[in-house]
């Protein structure tokens, strides 16, 4: 039932779409100013941005204060569950590995494959990170891989920044294809067409990201020295991603591509190694890194093997069925409800937006899968209770402020979405006519920056992209895919992602440094993707699949 209080979103509160867009951009500008100029901590910048967004929503958009408050609570809760929950569980698992001594063996095992930091970043940040993105998403891959790379000797800022950049190519198919499947259901277009177009558009990005990572670490010299290994990783990933996205759908491209790339690169490194070993730490002697016993290596990697097993189980339909309505574990669901104002917000088309959310404690929650992996690790490795208590205490202490930052950032995203500010920004770009082919991925980029999620950006702007395609007589699949592809390079500058990465590597309070590191690359990538979209639209329309309505 709709509440007595009603608010219909405004797309153009000032009577000029571009002036309204400038106003809607004000909270984002404020956030950038806080981080880049005033160098405030993440939670401080997030708090100020929420205040500015609330003022704009109340005075310019006319959104009632009670609905602004409900949007804040909804967003903050979403930030805590599942996002912060995933990060806390992931860091706890990592700390168990470190404090139990397993991580030292993991480092040794990676060193036996290659002691070269450039290739280690490709194996862990790009390949393993892509697998985790395909399985869990929500920032977990960056948290886990960045922490692993710091343990292997990379500086925290390097590890966090490089993992954020590596976590671009797989984002569109993250969390078992949810970004594309969700958009498909919303706009009424078969997911296979969108998945295929995304796979085709991602080819240049997926192929170039591993080389770009090495270039950032060691320049042109590094690319030349590691070229064979990086080519194997990039080609095997890109080809598999292209084939799987075009023939298998949206669910498996990340997982399959990551496994194939990791296997191909590891096997290749058995027969080839770079002439010069590159390290970002002071380690010079690699002679003591001899072959380790299989049992010892297996035991050390067991926490992450259990992580993979638990994630696979958690994604299975038969497992999820236990938590369906009326099933045996249905009681684990908790609803965050605003019954008195539910249905009070409607978009410009008159469709009601939900202010309620179901907090599913077990099913569909990757954080719970990671926690179960941690508990199984404690059992199988027989980790002493004092070590467990120390790991848990350190995790909760270190994650407290980052979790607040994440909550504030997602709260801002919900205020912007529910008030109509996000739609204002997208609508302004949609007025650019033929130039929209360039701005289509930019809208997705802005959407992911605002929400921290490619799924949210696709749900937010998918209908707008579809409408623009229809009005410009462009195949819908192109702009729908461009929204998702543009979004993947917005992930590295999303305040949510920045907060997660900083928390994982111990850079809490240094969010501005990491943001400056990734911003210029994100802008460069989105410009290139915009140009690539124009090339497809005007010169290569034949590669766009024919859209089939659902």
Locate each region found by the language model.
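Transmembrane helical segments that form the transport core of multi-pass membrane transport proteins
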Residues: 284, 288-443
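Re-entrant/interfacial helical elements at transmembrane boundaries that shape
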Residues: 140-148, 164, 177-188, 215-216, ...
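Structural signature of hydrophobic alpha-helical transmembrane segments
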Residues: 12-26, 79-83, 136-141, 192-207, ...
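Membrane-embedded alpha-helical segments and adjacent helix-loop junctions characteristic
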Residues: 69-152, 161, 382-468
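Alpha-helical transmembrane segments of multi-pass membrane proteins
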Residues: 118-130, 156-169, 190-210, 407-408, ...
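Juxtamembrane helix-boundary/capping and inter-helix hinge elements in multi-pass membrane proteins
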Residues: 98-102, 115-116, 149-158, 185-192, ...
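Hydrophobic mid-bilayer segments of alpha-helices in multi-pass membrane transport proteins
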Residues: 23-33, 40-62, 84-90, 230, ...
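Juxtamembrane and boundary regions of transmembrane helices in multi-pass small-molecule transporters
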Residues: 172-283, 485-550
